[in-house]
Amino acid sequence: MYKRQRLASQKARELINVGKEVEFICVGKKGKASLSSEFGDKIIDFFDFSEVRNLSFVQGDQIAQKIITLFEEDKFDICHLYFSKFESVLTQIPTEQVIIPCNLQVDDNEDSPSQEACYEYEPGEVEILSDLLPKNLSIQVFSALLENFASEQGARMTAMDNATRNADEMIDKLTITYNRSRQATITSELIEIISGAEAL
């Protein structure tokens, strides 16, 4: 699970080496703890949802609103989001996603018309985008929170399954050792009884 922190640290070092200023907003105690040793003075905010039983859009929106506020104050020009993408119970992929500026590229797999379509917007494009872009950011952050949560649960399931399997193997080995010891004790007692009977 620490691979995403390593990915974020590596990117931060690259940016610092070329003279860029880097700041972090951390989500979760472990993420903050792993980044604090090297980038403690660069952590500007921290969100802890460990007491939240069920993640909801509210948590994603809290983080997104903080990002939007900082962006509107011209505190940064690019925002990277780091999280673990859930592939399977055994596989979680550390992922980097640029959420500001907004990615406007069309997917190559999608059929795109050779000629750009002309649309009319009501209200105007600026009004629509000023409403949609913050919601889009909140959704992206919430989606990353859910992916990360699913990855965390998958990693826990795998760890618990491995621990259970190891415990079962240990119980089997201890049972065999106990049975051998018990058998040796019984055999020893039988030999003593037989030796005592022969002596009579």
Predicted ranges, named:
Residues 3-200:
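C-terminal beta-strand-loop-alpha-helix "lid" module of Rossmann-like NAD(P)-dependent dehydrogenases
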